[in-house]
Design a protein with these regions (language model features):
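PRPP-associated nucleotide enzymes
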Residues: 1-330
């Protein structure tokens, strides 16, 4: 047998950008470690500087960064972090981007438009990333944009476990805010024990971002507690209008459940006054005090991320984390 055999052990390292350091700390805590010390700041002209304060040579490094407000700044910071790790001889670099930046720009709606999600995936690869990890991509097909493994995690188990404590499945309905996400709603219905399905028919003008018109409900929601599910809440317009349509159609009450709480612009006002009994999101993105309101519940995503990171580090199966959900992992 040729070659050299060493007794060195693999070392798992978690590093964090400045967008949501609390999430990285929670992930590290779940893994029984600490976030690697680093220095990061912006120069007067806006350029970003990053340096890691410990050696990462030969390490399996997971770079955690959220991409909410200032998405371009945080994306650039994460790219610079990956570049620094590559030049410092990290053995493997996994980008952990729970809310993948530019995920909604995954195809061309009109001529002369970019496919920005593909561009971002290419940038990660060029910077030196070996692997990506995200939660609830806008479309699963985006995994094909990256030349390497992309672990697509699902927050559904986290959300469903909580929603079970908030509704009677025997008198509930799972509702998609549009026809395009009916498959997600179907998985929710199965997890809740086969509750009825419905969706809100809506139209959208692709030339006017963040605007849609909710028209009518397709399905039986009268007298039922409706669970309105989506991947994200941005300005809240789609969700607020859907809640109103459901209540006007005779729903007993409405609970909103979404993975990513972007909560841009008028979202807080819209969601707090739309009539929803509760709005549930995870902390894939930081939600400051100014964006919190009485009906909002924020669930931790760190345990799920930590389990996936441990599976990757141990060369295990990430897909097995979702065997009971009926979705394809990585």
């Amino acid at each position: 047998m040729t070659g050299i055999i060493t007794k060195g052990e693999k070392r798992l390292v978690v590093v964090s950008g400045r967008a949501h350091p609390e999430l990285a700390q929670d992930v590290a805590s779940e893994l029984g470690t600490e976030v690697l010390s680093s220095t990061a700041y912006d120069f007067a002209n806006g350029e970003t500087y990053v340096r890691f304060n410990e050696s990462v040579r030969g390490c399996d490094v997971f770079v955690v960064q959220s991409h909410g407000d200032r998405v371009n700044d945080w994306l650039m910071e994460q790219l610079i972090m990956v570049d620094a790790l590559k030049r410092a001889s990290a053995k493997r670099i996994t980008v952990v981007a729970p809310f993948f930046p530019y995920a909604r720009q995954d195809k061309k709606h009109l001529g002369r438009e970019p496919i920005s999600a593909r561009l971002v995936a290419d940038l990660y690869k060029t910077a030196g990333a070996d692997r990506l990890m995200s939660v609830d991509l806008h479309t699963s097909q985006e995994q094909g944009f990256f030349d390497g493994p992309w672990d697509h995690l699902w927050a559904q188990p986290v959300l469903v476990d909580y929603v079970r404590t908030r509704v009677d499945p025997g008198n509930a309905a799972v509702v998609s805010p549009d026809a395009g996400r009916i498959r997600v709603a179907e998985r929710w219905a199965n997890q809740l024990g086969g509750t009825p399905l419905a969706f809100v028919h809506k139209t959208r003008d692709v030339t006017r971002p963040n605007e849609s018109v909710a028209n009518r409900v397709v399905g039986d929601v009268e007298g039922r507690s409706c669970v309105l599910v989506d991947d994200m809440i941005d300005t809240g317009g789609t969700i607020a209008k859907a809640v109103q349509v459901l209540l006007d159609s005779g729903a007993k009450d409405v609970i909103v459940a979404a993975t990513h709480g972007v909560l841009s612009g008028p979202a807080v006002d819209r969601l707090s006054t739309c009539g929803a009994r509760e709005v549930i999101v995870t902390d894939t993105l930081p939600i400051p005090a100014g964006k919190r309101f009485d009906q909002l519940t924020v669930l931790p995503i760190a345990p799920l991320l930590a389990r996936a990171i441990k599976a990757v580090f141990d060369d295990g199966s990430v897909a097995s984390l979702f065997d009971t959900v009926g979705v394809a992992g990585a």
